[in-house]
Design a protein with these regions (language model features):
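N-terminal, positively charged nucleic-acid-binding surface of large information/translation enzymes
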Residues: 1-207, 248-261, 265-295, 305, ...
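Flexible, glycine/threonine-enriched loop-and-boundary segments that flank and lead into catalytic domains
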Residues: 7, 157-185, 390-391, 401, ...
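Active-site-adjacent bridging/hinge elements
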Residues: 7-15, 37, 73-76, 101-108, ...
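Glycine- and acidic
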Residues: 16-24, 82-86, 111-118, 239-245, ...
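Structured ligand/cofactor/substrate-binding pocket environments in proteins
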Residues: 27-39, 55-56, 124-127, 185-315, ...
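Alpha-helix initiation and N-capping motif
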Residues: 59, 63, 82, 97, ...
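Helix-rich, typically C-terminal accessory recognition domains appended to large enzymatic cores
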Residues: 103-111, 123-156, 170, 385-409, ...
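Short Cys/His-rich metal-coordination motifs, predominantly Zn2+-binding knuckles/fingers
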Residues: 154, 182, 224, 338, ...
Length: 720
């Protein structure tokens, strides 16, 4: 923990709060090493440096971990009920938080632990409620019936970030839809025949000579009898499939947009178009578990969606309406956490209106108030922000900030800080009120983190001094989900940007370039690199709490082959320096143990050089050049120091680390020390070592402090 200088200059940053789902992974440690570097570096320049630490409650992710733990005990969350289940989650949170803080301390990070925050602590809850209520009362939050990514296993809406695309070979079915009052038919091509019960139109391209004369006619939907219009829209690709596209607004995002454009709605078994958006009424054919509902006729109702597909195809064959089946490459959306196929589904959710907020956030980047490093990431930022949609902020789970809204028996909704404030604000009588069951998307509370963690909505000393923060270190994968939203919320509630510089790191992958994940069995705990771990413990760690069956054996085989002797201990400094050497401006970063060995050797070199110098008497701590070798090393030191400061300012720690390595090993050890040995002129060895220790300290704090104590015995380098 730093003893902070009383300086008007200040440097501040917030930790991207790790989820209380378990322990830290390599990506966390990589970013925290970078953040710790900048905290130490600015502190040593006499700047009041502050790094806000804390963890994230991580709604769905944490709830799933606890549900899986219960499952292993033969229990479910429904057996426990909401309150008892939440008690279990709080217990898990305490366990996980203990592990995480222990890991952070072992990485040597310099934070003030007594100012630790949690995105679900009492003060943070107050801030989250204030943000929600204020946005609602400014007409920037609303409740709407819209299409969302629905996870039928978790029975909740999930964000785009929590959906992964599985590319695979699938099938495209050509189905005959008879034209009403005609012997003709239109052949539609679809990868999802099971959704035909929700069809509300057939779309063709108005420039397609094959079909344009059918626009305005109706087709009869097989099995249902509903009459649906043939509409002309240039969205339809004439080259894809048959050129006729079934439009199912209740179960496809593109179809939803088309359905909305024509305000499709059903009246007495006939789907009509309208120029009034409020007429739009998409049809939902699935339950929350993705079973067919009562909108689907027998014998297809009350079946799992994939059984519906099978039954529909069989019946289409029987009726000779299945014209053709062909191979087709498809992209299947799966829940990142559940691995279940995501269903686009209509449901009531809460939304934030983002268009106006996004414009303000864009201005902040355009006018240089917020700068991305490397600069090319602002293109990614603008690409997302220029196509922003209203943000779905509700989740149908139990763990999280419960939405501060109450409903009465007549279907009215009231929003406020608590039930008493709601009754007062809306002048309500003693009618029964029920609180909204849904909780907020984790990203909603996370978007308040830069100012909420510093004390907002209270005007605390830290909030006044350290907000806006100086630097945000984050991964490119959450530029939109977190960075952009922090900017929108910060400008909305404080009128200021949340940070000035955004240092975007690449993602740490394994030596083969694969993403590190529990299911791939390639995760390495950074603490095991520091202290080492034997093979049996490593196997146990990698195969524990796997959420998918059958993986343990495969992961065990892979681990035994890759690490026959377990993992050696490399020490904190070698791990940190390896991370800095990897802090390139590339998107993907491969982590190799060979590089780690190189930096452990470097630490040994530093230690041996210091011990060698310590054999000589210390004549002075002040460097005064007495010969050509002294002048040369002084000149080289000044040049490398200037270059390193430049690299640090430009967020190129990879270049800076390389400069340190090359200077210490190649110039100081191999040339200057050897020259001093030969000439016997050793008076400047101690003073130059001292300068180097100060320069190197943010890169390798432990060994530099230990050497300084051994050789100079004059207190911490952090005070130099």
């Amino acid at each position: 923990e730093l003893e902070r200088p009383s300086s008007e200059d200040h440097f501040s940053q917030i930790i991207p709060p790790p989820n209380v789902t378990g322990t830290l992974h390599m990506g966390h440690s990589f970013q925290y090493a970078i953040m710790d570097f900048y905290t130490r570096y600015h502190h040593m320049k006499g700047t009041d440096s502050y790094w806000q630490v804390g963890t994230d409650h991580a709604g769905i992710a944490t709830q799933m971990v606890v549900e899986n733990n219960l499952l292993n005990e033969g229990k479910s969350k429904d057996d426990l009920g909401r309150e008892k289940f939440l008690d279990e989650v709080w217990k898990w949170k305490e366990y996980s938080e203990g592990k995480i803080s222990s890991q952070m301390k072992r990485l040597g990070i310099t934070v003030e632990w007594d100012k630790y925050r949690f995105t679900y602590d009492d003060d943070f809850c107050e801030g989250v409620n204030k943000a929600f209520v204020e946005l609602y009362r400014k007409d920037k939050i609303y409740r709407g019936y819209r299409l969302v990514n629905w996870d039928p296993s978790l029975k909740t809406a999930v964000s785009d970030l929590e959906v992964v695309r599985q590319e695979k070979d699938g099938l495209l079915w050509h189905i005959s839809y008879p034209l009403a009052d005609s012997d003709e038919a239109l052949i539609v091509a679809t990868t999802r025949p099971e959704t035909m019960f929700g069809d509300m139109a057939v779309a063709v391209n108005p420039n397609d000579d094959r079909f344009k004369h059918h626009i305005g006619k109706y087709v009869e939907l097989p099995f249902v009898g509903r009459k649906i219009p043939v509409i002309g829209d240039e969205y339809v690709d004439m080259e894809f499939g048959t050129g006729c596209l079934k439009i199912t607004p209740g179960h496809d995002f593109n179809d939803y947009d088309i359905g909305k454009k024509y305000a499709l709605h059903e009246v007495d078994g006939v789907v009509q178009t309208s120029d009034k958006l409020e007429d739009f009424a998409p049809i939902n054919i699935f339950t929350d578990e993705a079973f067919s509902n009562d909108m689907v006729p027998a014998p297809f109702n009350n079946l799992d969606r994939f059984k519906v597909r099978k039954a529909v195809l069989e019946e289409l064959r029987n009726k000779e309406l299945l014209v053709k089946e062909e191979k087709h490459h498809i992209s299947v959306p799966r829940g990142e956490r559940s691995n279940i196929v995501i269903e686009p589904k209509l449901s009531y959710q809460w939304y934030v209106k983002t268009e106006e907020m996004a414009k303000k956030a864009n201005e902040a980047v355009n006018n240089g108030e917020v700068v991305f490093h490397p600069g090319n990431w602002d293109k990614t930022y603008f690409n997302w922000m220029d196509n922003i949609q209203d943000w779905c902020i509700s989740r149908q789970i139990w763990w999280g900030h419960r939405i501060p809204a109450w409903h009465d028996d007549e279907g009215n909704t009231y929003v406020g800080f608590d039930e008493a404030e709601v009754r007062e604000f809306y002048s309500l009588d003693d009618r029964d009120l029920r609180q909204e069951e849904d909780v907020l998307d984790t990203w909603f509370s996370a978007s308040l983190w830069p100012f909420g963690s510093l004390g907002w909505p209270k005007e605390t000393k830290d909030f006044k001094k350290f907000f806006p923060t100086t630097l945000l270190v984050t991964g490119f994968d959450i530029i939109f989900f977190w960075v952009a939203r922090m900017m929108m919320m910060s400008l909305e509630f404080t009128g200021k940007v949340p940070f000035k510089d955004v240092y975007v790191t690449g993602l740490i992958r394994d030596e083969n370039g694969q993403k590190m994940s529990k299911s791939k069995g390639n995760i390495i705990d950074p603490i095991d690199l520091i202290y080492g771990i034997d093979l049996e413990d490593l196997v146990t760690k990698r195969t524990a709490n796997l959420m998918q069956e059958g993986l343990a054996e495969k992961i065990e085989r892979k681990t035994r082959k890759q690490f026959p002797n377990g993992i050696d201990s490399y020490g904190t400094d070698a791990v940190r320096m390896t991370f800095y050497s990897l802090a390139t401006h590339t998107r993907d970063i491969s982590f190799e143990l060979g590089r780690l060995k190189g930096y452990r050797n470097f630490c040994n070199k530093v230690w041996n050089a210091a011990r060698f110098i310590n054999n000589y008497p210390m004549e002075s701590q002040e460097f005064v050049a007495k010969n050509d070798a002294d002048k040369w090393i002084e000149d080289e030191f000044n040049k490398v120091t200037e270059q390193i400061h430049k690299n640090i300012a430009e967020y190129r720690l990879d270049f800076a680390m390389n400069e340190v390595y090359e200077f210490f090993w190649g110039k100081f050890c191999d040339k200057y020390i050897e020259e001093c040995k030969t000439s016997g002129e050793t008076a400047n060895l101690h003073p130059m070592l001292k300068k180097i220790l100060v320069l190197m300290h943010p890169f390798c704090p432990f060994i530099t402090e230990e050497i300084n104590e051994l050789v100079f015995k004059d207190g911490s380098l952090m005070k130099k």
